[in-house]
Swiss-Prot record:
Function: Central component of the KaiABC oscillator complex, which constitutes the main circadian regulator in cyanobacteria. Complex composition changes during the circadian cycle to control KaiC phosphorylation. KaiA stimulates KaiC autophosphorylation, while KaiB sequesters KaiA, leading to KaiC autodephosphorylation. Clock output pathways impact the RpaA transcriptional regulator. KaiC enhances the autophosphorylation activity of SasA, which then transfers its phosphate group to RpaA to activate it. KaiB and KaiC together enhance the phospho-RpaA dephosphatase activity of CikA.
Organism: Rippkaea orientalis (strain PCC 8801 / RF-1)
Protein name: Circadian clock oscillator protein KaiC
List of residues that carry Phosphothreonine: 433
Assigned EC number: 2.7.11.1, 3.6.4.-
InterPro entries on file: Circadian_clock_KaiC-rel (IPR051347), Circadian_KaiC_bact (IPR013503), KaiC (IPR030665), KaiC-like_dom (IPR014774), KaiC_C (IPR047222), KaiC_dom (IPR010624), KaiC_N (IPR047221), P-loop_NTPase (IPR027417)
Subunit structure: Homohexamer; hexamerization is dependent on ATP-binding. The KaiABC complex composition changes during the circadian cycle to control KaiC phosphorylation. Complexes KaiC(6), KaiA(2-4):KaiC(6), KaiB(6):KaiC(6) and KaiC(6):KaiB(6):KaiA(12) are among the most important forms, many form cooperatively. KaiC interacts with SasA, activating its autokinase function and leading to RpaA activation.
Cofactor: Mg(2+)
């Protein structure tokens, strides 16, 4: 994602339209800022309470010291230095060690617990001088100030505090340091800052949000402004992991992954034939249909085939437990437990509501990075779509499919439709365009009996069987049979039997059209 870590300024600083930047090494942040934060300028980080402002400020300093050996200064107006150091330990950052090494200095400007009385006119002259002294003494190149909102809350004269904040920003710019200044806002979508600080710190503005969408909260980061340089527009989802902030720059993803002509087996011989010899390696397959149509069975056969060939595979299940998946698979002659014992299969089961979509995406990426599978399956996408917006869900699917293709992994996903019989939409969340192959499964009623139908609805770059075939499920798995040759309107859910005379008449018409075409030629 980033350039190789180096202490040389040549590799840590970037020039974009005359503005030099320093990489933050925060996952995804350097992508959406097109190279990091502008050097020698102050960036305002605004957000409501709990959005991760302080975390971003601390991570910015820690990474600068760790990766580039840039000394840093942290000015705190809210938390005590002890709390900041203790909280950083949760992410594996030993701030006390770098403080002892003289690479980080924490300047405590937090309120006096015994209270304080302001006599006469208020100014930050003494604090500004302390900050300048610390910058010069420790040769600090990076500064984080958290948070200027606390200064306004301590003193009544807001206009005077604005003036003093402006003086502080001007001094930081004069000293040539790259700084982050956090501020709090009241609403997720409203004024940038609570006290109009953005009027003075307007070169660069980053907005962090934690919005309740549907039934779940969703964190996003937006680069509102980077004066004099380019950046990506819009909101980008992020999550907070054990390593700190992790942004998913979905808009930065490029369609540059390689495409293989190699085929892999689905684990079902007849389905391979319907797909022209199997699925393309590195492709994304979607099986969609009502509950009970056999989607999980197809996924199980797909994973079994991969493990049979010595490939590693991961199943991310969001509807069934490990025990239930293993039991059901065993009833079809598939031994998931044996595959796990051999180290070829990994089953990961969790409720969709246990985390946000960004957290699920991060877990999927981490597990893939650690286990290095050739095949993955998600059962099912529709479970993850519950309680979230279409846009958030689509971004999640793009993130998963993009990462799978980048890692050259074949993905098999399932989607449960609401409609039990008949035609159903597979484009409600716009995921059909993201997948390479779509397999439609559905129930059909023929002569008073319920049957199952399977159809390869779409397959990019390959011939595939257009027929709608009947299939059944027994103890050995799925059995795909011939097409419903004597029926039409299967997909609509209202199959109609075609009589022999009608078939002959249709054949005669087709022959007549062909003969007429040949005569004209």
């Amino acid at each position: 994602m980033n350039e190789p870590i180096s202490n040389s300024s040549k590799k840590t600083e970037n020039t974009t339209q005359g503005v030099r930047k320093i990489r933050t090494m925060i996952e995804g942040f350097d992508e959406i800022t097109h190279g990091g934060l502008p050097i020698g300028r102050t960036t305002l980080v605004s957000g409501t309470s709990g959005t991760g402002k302080t975390l971003l400020a601390v991570q910015f300093l820690y990474h600068g010291i760790k990766y580039f050996d840039y000394p840093g200064l942290f000015v705190t107006f809210e938390e005590s230095p002890t709390d900041i150091i203790q909280n950083a330990y949760s992410f594996g950052w030993d701030l006390q060690e770098i403080v002892d090494e003289g690479k980080l200095f924490i300047l405590d400007a937090s309120p006096d617990p015994d209270g304080q009385e302001v006599v006469g006119s208020f100014d930050l002259s003494a604090l500004i001088e302390r900050i300048q002294y610390a910058i010069n003494k420790y040769k600090a190149q990076l500064v984080s100030i958290d948070s200027v909102t606390a200064v306004f809350q301590q003193y009544d004269a807001a206009s005077v505090v604005r003036r003093e904040i402006f003086r502080l920003v001007a001094r930081l710019k004069l000293l040539g340091v790259t700084s982050i200044m956090t501020t709090e806002r009241i609403e997720e979508y409203g004024p940038i800052a609570r006290y109009g600080v953005e009027e003075f710190v307007s070169d660069n503005v980053v907005v962090l949000r934690n919005v309740l969408e549907g039934e779940r909260r969703r964190r996003t980061a937006e680069i509102l402004k980077l004066r004099g340089t380019t950046h990506m527009k819009g909101e980008y989802p992020f999550t907070i992991t054990n390593d700190g902030i992790n942004i998913f720059p979905l808009g930065a993803m490029r369609l540059t992954q390689r495409s293989s002509n190699a085929r892999i087996s689905s684990g079902v011989k007849t389905l391979d034939e319907m797909c022209g010899g199997g699925f393309f390696k590195d492709s994304i397959i979607l099986a969609t249909g009502a509950t009970g149509t056999g989607k999980t069975l197809l996924v199980s056969k797909f994973l079994e085939e991969g493990c049979r060939q010595g490939e590693r595979a991961i199943l991310f299940a969001y509807e069934e437990s490990r025990a239930q998946l293993s039991r059901n698979a065993f009833s079809w002659g598939i031994d998931f437990e044996e595959m796990e014992r051999k180290g070829l299969l990994k089953l990961l089961c969790s409720y969709p509501e246990s985390a946000g979509l960004e957290d699920h995406l991060q877990i999927i990426k981490s597990e893939i990075s650690e286990f290095k599978p050739s095949r993955i399956a998600i059962d099912s996408l529709s479970a993850l779509a519950r309680g979230v917006t279409n846009n958030a869900f689509r971004q999640f699917v793009i993130g998963v499919t993009g990462y799978a293709k980048q890692e050259e992994i074949t993905g098999f996903f399932t989607n449960t439709t609401d409609q039990f019989m008949g035609a159903h939409s597979i484009t409600e969340s716009h995921i059909s365009t993201i997948t390479d192959t779509i397999i439609m499964l559905q129930y059909v009623e023929i002569r008073g009996e319920m049957s199952r139908a399977i159809n390869v609805f779409k397959m990019r770059g390959s011939w595939h069987d257009k027929g709608i075939r009947e299939y059944s499920i027994n103890e050995s798995g799925p059995t795909i049979q011939d097409s419903f040759r004597n029926y039409e309107r299967i997909i609509s859910g209202s199959p109609t039997r075609i009589t022999v005379d009608e078939k002959n008449e249709l054949s005669r018409i087709v022959r007549g059209v062909k003969d007429k075409t040949l005569d004209e030629e």
